[in-house]
């Protein structure tokens, strides 16, 4: 069983790893100018990063079911440091885009750690543990903008990736020392069978399928908000610096509290309710985001609300899918998070196009449409299936050993 200090360490390590793929968001204008990438196409930086992430999810994360997690986590973290270094010293656009795609693929170490947490946390505290680690991931996503903005203004954009490479190297050393040597998973599948099994899960598991679609849509929505945000903030009438743009990441980090609390609620069988509240919040917050032309305060509040809603739904999603089968956690994570990457990649390229053609109003309309579409999908899916409700009941009936108390609570299932 994982101890609290190791769970907190995982939260930090996940935050660092995932931050590396979002460092570029507040720097898109600078990177575009450096490598002569037009404004309408600069979203390709984030899109390629997410494509790399999706490839890593499909090809690397399932290995957690057959390879020792300690070796996989440490090895990926070292390789991530190398990719960060290559990104920092890129001499031209092609090298930069290739390096940042590889960086995205290696950053999936976060999901290997989430899977490790789900498998080894005490069953009665699984939701809380996932919430802590997920809180670290989302905090890393948001604080990455603050860190990269400050470092870019002080030392140039390349320093962001150089310092991150050093931090990743140090983190790999710490993880090597503290992670126990675990036995290899008992599955007898070969690698090819493992990948096929991952795809088959999407066909056979309705909870995984529906929650993956929700993940794709909510991450598309938040990417639509955050990717082009640097463009109006650095232009008239605000003319904010990269450091000041990065401060919006601090506002969003307040929403990270949602992941911690949502995990506890899900442990108490409230995953469906958490999902509904989170999706309503995300949909309504776009009204505040649309006030950017008059005030920065509305945008800051919108970032907090949308992030809070997203994190709550994301933790609820994971809480439900990780109850399916402990021996499949690596493949469940890969299947679920692949949809997250698809949504993020699509949101990045669509949002910069929307901004270049319709301005900030177009961005807000796009984001609101995605959020309302997600809410509509969830309502329709929930009314047609009792699978998730059964999973919520099961979570309320789990004792500290992780056994479902169906004998004592059989009436709940009828």
Residue ranges of predicted features:
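Structural signature of the two symmetry-related core transmembrane helices
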Residues: 71-85, 165, 273-287, 368
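Intracellular juxtamembrane helix-capping segments at the cytosolic ends
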Residues: 109-121, 312-325
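Helix-to-loop junctions at the C-terminal end of transmembrane segments
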Residues: 57-68, 258-271, 355
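Juxtamembrane intracellular "pre-TM" segments in multi-pass secondary transporters
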Residues: 180-212
């Amino acid at each position: 069983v994982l101890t609290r200090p190791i769970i907190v360490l995982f939260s930090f390590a996940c935050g660092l790893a995932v931050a590396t793929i979002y460092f570029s968001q507040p720097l898109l204008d600078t990177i575009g100018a450096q490598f002569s990438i037009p404004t309408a196409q600069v979203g390709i930086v984030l899109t390629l990063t997410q494509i790399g992430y999706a490839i890593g999810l499909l090809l690397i994360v399932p290995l957690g079911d057959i390879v020792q997690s300690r070796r996989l986590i440490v090895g990926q973290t070292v390789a991530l440091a190398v990719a960060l270094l290559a990104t920092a010293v890129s001499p031209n656009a092609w090298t930069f885009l290739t390096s940042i795609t590889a960086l995205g693929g290696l950053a999936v170490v976060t999901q290997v750690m989430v899977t490790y947490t789900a498998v080894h946390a005490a069953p009665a505290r699984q939701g809380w543990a996932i919430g802590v680690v997920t809180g670290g991931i989302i905090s890393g996503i948001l604080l990455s903008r603050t860190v990269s903005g400050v470092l870019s203004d002080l030392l140039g954009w390349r320093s962001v990736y150089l310092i991150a490479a050093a931090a990743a190297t140090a983190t790999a050393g710490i993880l090597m020392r503290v992670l126990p040597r675990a036995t290899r998973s008992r599955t007898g599948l070969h690698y090819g069978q493992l990948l096929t099994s991952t795809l088959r899960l999407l066909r056979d598991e309705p909870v995984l399928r529906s929650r993956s679609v929700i993940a794709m849509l909510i991450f598309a929505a938040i990417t639509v908000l955050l990717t082009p945000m640097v463009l109006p903030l650095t232009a008239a009438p605000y003319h904010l610096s990269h450091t000041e743009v990065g401060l919006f990441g601090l506002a969003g980090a307040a929403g990270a509290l949602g992941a911690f609390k949502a995990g506890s609620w899900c442990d108490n069988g409230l995953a469906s309710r958490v999902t509904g509240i989170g999706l309503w919040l995300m949909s309504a917050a776009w009204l505040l985001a649309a006030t950017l032309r008059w005030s920065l305060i509305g945008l800051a509040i919108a970032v907090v609300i949308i992030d809070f809603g997203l994190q709550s739904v994301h933790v609820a999603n994971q809480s439900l899918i990780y109850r399916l089968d402990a021996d499949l956690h690596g493949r469940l994570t890969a299947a679920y998070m692949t949809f997250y990457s698809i949504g993020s990649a699509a949101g990045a390229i669509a949002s910069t196009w929307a901004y270049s053609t319709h301005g900030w109003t177009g961005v807000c309309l796009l984001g609101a449409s995605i959020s309302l579409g997600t809410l509509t999908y969830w309502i329709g899916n929930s009314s047609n299936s009792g699978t998730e409700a059964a999973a919520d009941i099961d979570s309320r009936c789990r004792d500290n050993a992780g056994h479902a108390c169906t004998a004592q609570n059989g009436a709940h299932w009828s």
